[in-house]
């Protein structure tokens, strides 16, 4: 084992250090506030499940299951997997806990997912997603609601001009089978050229070819038959009803006839929010779609459903690159600096009294380091502290404290009760 291997990141994973957490907290808070306003409830479920759950939900021949999942045996020889996506685990939890009743159920969740992929910018082996799911609605209003929520999230983060919405309808299972026959005919005509760049069997699951990044094949596929021509009147009408309401509410979109989601449980409407701001390549920030048969396929009662997931690392990369004005939130509001160690006990008692008065609404730090006073003052300034409270033996003896406002550089020595009133005035907005 290499000397430093034990403290290195596992390839494809990243630490989020305290100086980066402010933007994560900022983004997550914005998202949760909007999702909550639509009356979605948070659900939490394990990051590991029985591996069969994902092969049942996603399909044994899907690349996520047969190549990208982290699978291991526990001590009882049970085959477990780290979750590669959230929908399957959410559905399992809903069935197990009997959450899916006759009414519409709205849920959201957030946490790490795991896929063994080649790490690159915007793609990691451990990545975070925020998932939003609606169970029990067969109306296009459910798709619209998820698109509307995500659109409001982009606006709240000031990135709405840097993302765009792509839509498609992939029809029901029977309609997709009809389309695959037409697509297969087209691909077999060009089989010799395709085989140079695409090693998979194009006759087995021809739709998978739309996942390729090869430029030659992508250009060739522009001539391929479109699935919209193979879907029935009901699927077509539902799709265009959604397009119509998006137009009415001025949410721009683009119909992408070759948009197919990578997971096999989707049917009818699928969508992706894309951006070209990361890596100068087209990359999905949010993906979603309808999966009416998944709950029943996993052992529950038939429950139509729609969901989407936001890739948080990608979203945060985008927000960070575009919103330079998002400043690091002040680490502390008040820094208490004792002049010497002799009064440490009195300082700690005072700091706890201050926390009681402000009911945890202010962030208060006691600097009990061995640094000299000037360095402590400098550190408080670096941390963005608004005020410094200076306590020495004289202050303790006279029941006074010295307040230094680091914004105005003004300094006051006041009796404790007067000083607390002064602090309240300085932090009026924080403590309301």
Curated annotation (Swiss-Prot):
Protein EC: 6.1.1.21
Location of this chain's protein in the cell: Cytoplasm
GO MF term list: ATP binding; histidine-tRNA ligase activity
UniProt-listed InterPro entries: aa-tRNA-synth_II, aa-tRNA-synth_II/BPL/LPL, Anticodon-bd, Anticodon-bd_dom_sf, His-tRNA-ligase, HisRS-like_core, HisRS/HisZ
Gene Ontology CC terms: cytoplasm
Cited Pfam families: HGTP_anticodon, tRNA-synt_His
Major subcellular site: cytoplasm
Family to which the UniProt record says this protein belongs: Belongs to the class-II aminoacyl-tRNA synthetase family.
Name used for this protein in its record: Histidine--tRNA ligase
Name of the gene this protein is made from: hisS
């Amino acid at each position: 084992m290499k000397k430093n291997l034990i403290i290195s990141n596992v390839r494809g994973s990243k630490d989020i250090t305290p100086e980066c957490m402010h933007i994560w907290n900022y983004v997550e808070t914005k998202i949760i506030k909007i999702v909550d306003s639509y009356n979605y409830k948070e659900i939490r479920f394990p990051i590991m499940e029985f591996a069969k759950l994902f092969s049942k939900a996603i399909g044994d021949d899907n690349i996520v299951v047969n190549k990208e999942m982290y699978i291991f045996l526990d001590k009882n020889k049970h085959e477990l997997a780290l979750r590669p996506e959230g929908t399957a685990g959410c559905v399992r939890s809903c069935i197990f806990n009997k959450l899916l009743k006759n009414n519409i159920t709205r849920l959201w969740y957030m946490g790490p997912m795991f896929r063994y992929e080649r790490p690159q910018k915007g793609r990691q082996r451990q990545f975070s997603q925020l998932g939003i799911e609606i169970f029990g609605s067969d109306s296009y209003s459910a798709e619209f609601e998820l698109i509307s929520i995500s659109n409001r999230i982009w606006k709240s983060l000031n990135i709405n001009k840097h993302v765009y919405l792509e839509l498609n309808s992939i029809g029901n299972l029977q309609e997709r089978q009809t389309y695959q026959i037409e697509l297969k005919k087209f691909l077999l005509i060009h089989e010799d050229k395709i085989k140079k760049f695409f090693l998979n069997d194009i006759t087995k699951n021809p739709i998978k070819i739309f996942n390729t990044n090869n430029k030659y094949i992508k250009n060739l596929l522009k001539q391929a038959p479109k699935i919209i021509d193979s879907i029935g009147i009901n699927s077509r009408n539902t799709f265009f009803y959604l397009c119509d309401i998006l137009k009415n509410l001025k949410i721009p979109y683009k119909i992408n006839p070759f948009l197919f989601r990578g997971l096999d449980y989707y049917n009818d409407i699928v969508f992706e929010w894309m951006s070209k701001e990361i890596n100068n390549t087209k990359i999905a920030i949010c993906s979603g779609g309808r999966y009416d048969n998944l709950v029943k396929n996993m052992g529950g009662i038939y429950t139509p459903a729609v969901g989407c997931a936001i890739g948080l690392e990608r979203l945060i990369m985008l927000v960070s690159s575009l919103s330079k004005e998002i400043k690091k939130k002040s680490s502390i509001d008040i820094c208490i600096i004792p002049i010497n160690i002799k009064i440490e006990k009195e300082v700690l008692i005072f700091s706890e009294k201050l926390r009681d008065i402000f009911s945890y609404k202010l962030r208060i730090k006691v600097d009990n380091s061995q640094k000299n006073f000037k360095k402590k003052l400098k550190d408080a300034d670096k941390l963005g502290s608004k005020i410094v409270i200076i306590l020495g033996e004289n202050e303790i003896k006279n029941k006074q404290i010295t307040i230094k406002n680091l914004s105005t550089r003004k300094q006051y020595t006041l009796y404790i009760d007067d000083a607390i009133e002064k602090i309240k005035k300085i932090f009026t907005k924080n403590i309301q």
